[in-house]
C-alpha cells in the first residue's frame, strides 16, 4: 500500500467533479485525488509531498492525497463511519479545514457538516454520534486554544465582546469546558428568547439553564 509520495507535480486534472494531480516519483506518474484547496496550493513543476490513502478495488486503485498527515488520518477516521465513503470524506475535508471539521463533529454542528457535498442530515448525525468521543480526545486535531471572541463559530452570536469575555470567565470558573460553553451559547442564540447583546447576566442565566438541562 502507498502511504506517502514525494516527487514533482507534473499535471493537474479534473474529471466529473473530482480533481487532483499527477506526481512523478522515480520515473512513475501517480494520479492522486485531492481536495480543491490542496490542488490549488502548488503549481505544475513544483516539488510535491503528499500523505496518501490507497483504496483498492477490483477495477483498480485510487490514491487520495493530503498535504498534512493529520488530514490523512482524519480522512481514514471518517471512512470508518458506516455510510461514509472516500468521496464523502474528501468532500468534508474540502468544506472545512481539519480543526474546523473536528470542532463541528465534536460540537454536533449539523449545519456545518451538511455544507459538504453529498452529506445529508442523517449522515451528519451519524458522523457526530460515532466520532464525537473519539475526536474530543484527539488533541493533535483540535483547534489551538483561543478566546471565545476569536472563535469563528461564536463571532456571529449577538453578544458584545466585553460581556462575552465575562461570560467565558464565569463559566470556566464554574468548571465548564470550552466546548460546553460554545454549545450553550449557540443554543441560547438560536432559541426563542435571545437576550440583549449587552445583557451579560441574562446570557449567563440562559447558558446555565441550558447546561443544566443538557447534563
UniProtKB/Swiss-Prot annotation:
Start and end residues of each stretch annotated as Domain II: 68-146
Region of interest (Flexible linker), ranges: 147-158
Cellular compartments per GO CC: cytoplasm; Holliday junction helicase complex; Holliday junction resolvase complex
Gene3D superfamilies in alphabetical order: 5' to 3' exonuclease, C-terminal subdomain, Nucleic acid-binding proteins
Domain of life, per lineage: Bacteria
Claim: Cytoplasm is one of the keywords in the record: yes
UniProt subcellular location: Cytoplasm
Keyword Lyase appears in the UniProt entry: no
Entry-linked Pfam families: HHH_5, RuvA_C, RuvA_N
Keywords recorded for this protein, A-Z: Cytoplasm, DNA damage, DNA recombination, DNA repair, DNA-binding
Residue numbers spanned by region Domain I: 1-67
GO molecular function: ATP binding; four-way junction DNA binding; four-way junction helicase activity
GO biological process: DNA recombination; DNA repair
InterPro entries (alphabetical): DNA_helicase_Holl-junc_RuvA_I, Hlx-hairpin-Hlx_DNA-bd_motif, NA-bd_OB-fold, RuvA, RuvA_2-like, RuvA_C
Matching SUPFAM superfamilies: Nucleic acid-binding proteins (SSF50249), RuvA domain 2-like (SSF47781)
Chain spans, region Domain III: 159-215
Location, primary (coarse class): cytoplasm
Self-association and partners: Homotetramer. Forms an RuvA(8)-RuvB(12)-Holliday junction (HJ) complex. HJ DNA is sandwiched between 2 RuvA tetramers; dsDNA enters through RuvA and exits via RuvB. An RuvB hexamer assembles on each DNA strand where it exits the tetramer. Each RuvB hexamer is contacted by two RuvA subunits (via domain III) on 2 adjacent RuvB subunits; this complex drives branch migration. In the full resolvosome a probable DNA-RuvA(4)-RuvB(12)-RuvC(2) complex forms which resolves the HJ.
Stored HAMAP family: DNA_HJ_migration_RuvA (MF_00031)
Similarity annotation: Belongs to the RuvA family.
Function: The RuvA-RuvB-RuvC complex processes Holliday junction (HJ) DNA during genetic recombination and DNA repair, while the RuvA-RuvB complex plays an important role in the rescue of blocked DNA replication forks via replication fork reversal (RFR). RuvA specifically binds to HJ cruciform DNA, conferring on it an open structure. The RuvB hexamer acts as an ATP-dependent pump, pulling dsDNA into and through the RuvAB complex. HJ branch migration allows RuvC to scan DNA until it finds its consensus sequence, where it cleaves and resolves the cruciform DNA.
Record remark: domains: Has three domains with a flexible linker between the domains II and III and assumes an 'L' shape. Domain III is highly mobile and contacts RuvB.
Protein name: Holliday junction branch migration complex subunit RuvA
Organism, as annotated: Synechococcus sp. (strain WH7803)
Gene that specifies this protein: ruvA
Amino acid at each position: 500500500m502507498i502511504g506517502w509520495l514525494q516527487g514533482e507535480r507534473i499535471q493537474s486534472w479534473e474529471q466529473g467533479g473530482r480533481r487532483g494531480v499527477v506526481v512523478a516519483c522515480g520515473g512513475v506518474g501517480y494520479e492522486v485525488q485531492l481536495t480543491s484547496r490542496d490542488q490549488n496550493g502548488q503549481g505544475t513543476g513544483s516539488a510535491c509531498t503528499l500523505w496518501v490513502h490507497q483504496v483498492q478495488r477490483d477495477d483498480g486503485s485510487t490514491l487520495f492525497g493530503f498535504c498534512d498527515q493529520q488530514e490523512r488520518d482524519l480522512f481514514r477516521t471518517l471512512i470508518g463511519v458506516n455510510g461514509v465513503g472516500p468521496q464523502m470524506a474528501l468532500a468534508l475535508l474540502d468544506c472545512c479545514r481539519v480543526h474546523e471539521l473536528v470542532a463541528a463533529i465534536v460540537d454536533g454542528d449539523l449545519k456545518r457538516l451538511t455544507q459538504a457535498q453529498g452529506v445529508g442530515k442523517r449522515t451528519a448525525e451519524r458522523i457526530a454520534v460515532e466520532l464525537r468521543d473519539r475526536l474530543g480526545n484527539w488533541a493533535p486535531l483540535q483547534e489551538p486554544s483561543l478566546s471565545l471572541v476569536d472563535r469563528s463559530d461564536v463571532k456571529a452570536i449577538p453578544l458584545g465582546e466585553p460581556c462575552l469575555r465575562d461570560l467565558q470567565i464565569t463559566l470556566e470558573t464554574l468548571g465548564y469546558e470550552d466546548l460546553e460553553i460554545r454549545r450553550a451559547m449557540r443554543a441560547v442564540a438560536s432559541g426563542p428568547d435571545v437576550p440583549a447583546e449587552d445583557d451579560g447576566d441574562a446570557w449567563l442565566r440562559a447558558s446555565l439553564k441550558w447546561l443544566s438541562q443538557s447534563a
